[in-house]
């Protein structure tokens, strides 16, 4: 390779380097120019956006300012109108006051004129009265001189003569006034009673001594009776209610004079039929469950009754006793319904006489409360009711109303008299009571009480409409030999003390159970 070639190569390299540098520099300048242009564009765009945002914010501020100005102007207009209305009202009141003031001024002037006239007339009357008195004195002196009697003697003689003439007329007038007053009192009393009776519309139906349980089919009767009658005997023994299973299709009749026991038996039997499992153990469980259900129903009935008559703050135990009245009858009349009716009647009578209606309702509701437990406690229902009212802190007026509603003691308040009157109204209403049913129930109660009076007797149930008394005894106190003796003693006492048609079967039941648990 010669020198020329080397120079050419070197020249080419130099030219290449120079050319590359020039190209690179041009490219760099071009990129810088583009970057500057881009930066300027970005800045310009940012300025434009900032201007737009500024314009938007200004517009929004103007709009908000306009809205605020309009709201402020509206509030100002409303306040101005309100002030104008108030000013108008004040002006009207001021005008009214001015008119009233003018009227009062005129009335004062008229009154002053009348007073002056009255004073003038009074002076004239006084002058005339003085002259009349002078004339009277002169005439009296002249009469005394002529008659020879003093003024006092003449007055006494005249009064005696007038008294003799009027004595008979006065006696006749007094007699007429007494008759008129008596007729007025009778009429007022009748109007009060009629008003109270007309304001109360109450329906009562005579209570029955039987309940009917419907069955899904007649095959259920055999299951209720059980093998050799053990199921029906268990149910009758636990409830004291007679189960009558006859040809009546798909029905069993429960007979018993105690409505609570009958309801327990009915509830238990309905639950047994629904459950389908009928055997002595299950019967015991269902009877216990039915007792709890009936106990709840009793308490609910008491609470409903106290709520209906607005008798608040009554002791819970007393409320429950009131609920028991729902299962008690008096001559066929439901005692709870009767008590509520008496409460309403007493309240209406109290309202007519201006007495305390709430207290009258409370006394009316509780007047027969002793009947709820009179078959469990010794004494009349009045005595028991008084003791219950005292025990649970009732008002003295309520206690006296209970004590006096049958005339056992004198009533000490108008409320007591009104409760007695309301009780008589409710009981005397046609169809409210039946004498025969009450006598029948009393005979059955007496039969049970007589049987339970012997030692060792746990329970006694009158069944078969009173033709049988079933006596449950304690096996620890009464053995088999004593059972026969007890049956004979009860039979003899029934024959001596009770009156009854036909004959009564005395059955003494002694049951011993041995229970062990396998573990």
Curated annotation (Swiss-Prot):
Q: Which gene encodes it?
A: rny
Listed under GO cellular component are: plasma membrane
State what protein this is by name.
Answer: Ribonuclease Y
Q: Which organism is it from?
A: Staphylococcus aureus (strain JH9)
Q: What processes in GO biological process is this protein linked to?
A: mRNA catabolic process
The first-level EC class reads hydrolase
User: Which EC numbers characterise this protein's activity in its record?
Assistant: 3.1.-.-
Supply the CDD domains for this chain. Answer: HDc, KH-I_RNaseY
Under InterPro entries, the record lists: HD/PDEase_dom (IPR003607), HD_domain (IPR006674), HDIG_dom (IPR006675), KH_dom (IPR004087), KH_dom_type_1 (IPR004088), KH_dom_type_1_sf (IPR036612), Ribonuclease_Y (IPR017705), RNase_Y_N (IPR022711)
Q: Give the record's membrane topology.
A: Single-pass membrane protein
- Which stretches make up the HD domain? 335-428
Boundaries of each KH domain copy?
209-269
At the highest ranks, the source species' classification is: Bacteria, Bacillati, Bacillota, Bacilli, Bacillales
């Amino acid at each position: 390779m010669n020198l020329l070639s080397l120079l050419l190569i070197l020249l080419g390299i130099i030219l290449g380097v120079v050319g590359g540098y020039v190209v690179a520099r041009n490219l760099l300048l071009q990129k810088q120019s583009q970057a500057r242009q881009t930066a300027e564009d970005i800045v310009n765009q940012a300025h434009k956006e900032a201007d737009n945002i500024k314009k938007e914010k200004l517009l929004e501020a103007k709009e908000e300012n306009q809205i605020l100005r309009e709201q402020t102007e509206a509030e100002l207009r409303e306040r101005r109108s309100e002030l104008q209305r108030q000013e108008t009202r004040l002006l009207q009141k001021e005008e009214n006051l001015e008119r009233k003031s003018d009227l009062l001024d005129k009335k004062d002037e008229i009154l002053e004129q009348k007073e002056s006239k009255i004073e003038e007339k009074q002076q004239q009357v006084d002058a005339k009265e003085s002259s009349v008195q002078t004339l009277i004195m002169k005439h009296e002196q002249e009469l005394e001189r002529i008659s020879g009697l003093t003024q006092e003697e003449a007055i006494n003689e005249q009064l005696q003569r007038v008294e003799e003439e009027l004595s008979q007329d006065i006696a006749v007038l007094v007699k007429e006034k007494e008759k008129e007053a008596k007729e007025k009192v009778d009429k007022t009393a009748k109007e009060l009673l009629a008003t109270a009776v007309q304001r109360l519309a109450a329906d009562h139906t005579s209570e029955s001594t039987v309940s009917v349980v419907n069955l899904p089919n007649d095959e259920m009767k055999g299951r209720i009776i059980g093998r050799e009658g053990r199921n029906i005997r268990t149910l009758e023994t636990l409830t004291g209610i007679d189960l009558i299973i006859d040809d009546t299709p798909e029905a069993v009749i429960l007979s018993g004079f105690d409505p609570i026991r009958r309801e327990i038996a009915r509830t238990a039997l309905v639950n047994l039929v629904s459950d389908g499992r009928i055997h002595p153990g299950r019967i015991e469980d269902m009877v216990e469950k039915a007792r709890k259900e009936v106990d709840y129903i009793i308490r609910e009935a008491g609470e409903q009754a106290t709520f209906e008559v607005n008798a608040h703050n009554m002791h819970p135990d007393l409320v429950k006793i009131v609920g028991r009245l729902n299962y008690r009858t008096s001559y066929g009349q439901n005692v709870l319904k009767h008590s509520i009716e008496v409460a309403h009647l007493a309240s209406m009578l109290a309202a007519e006489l201006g007495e305390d209606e709430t207290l009258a309702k409370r006394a009316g509701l509780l007047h027969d409360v002793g009947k709820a437990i009179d078959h469990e406690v010794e004494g009349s229902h009045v005595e028991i009711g008084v003791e219950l009212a005292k025990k649970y802190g009732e008002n003295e007026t309520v206690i006296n109303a209970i004590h006096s509603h049958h005339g056992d003691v004198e009533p000490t308040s108008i409320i007591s008299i009104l409760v007695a009157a309301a009780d008589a109204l409710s009981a005397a209403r046609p169809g409210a009571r039946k004498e025969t049913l009450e006598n029948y129930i009393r005979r059955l109660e007496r039969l049970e009480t007589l049987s339970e009076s012997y030692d060792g007797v746990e329970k006694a149930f009158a069944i078969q409409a009173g033709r049988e008394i079933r006596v449950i005894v304690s096996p620890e106190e009464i053995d088999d030999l004593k059972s026969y003796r007890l049956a004979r003693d009860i039979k003899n006492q029934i024959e001596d003390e009770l009156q009854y048609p036909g004959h009564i079967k005395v059955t003494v039941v002694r049951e011993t159970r041995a229970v062990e648990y396998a573990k």
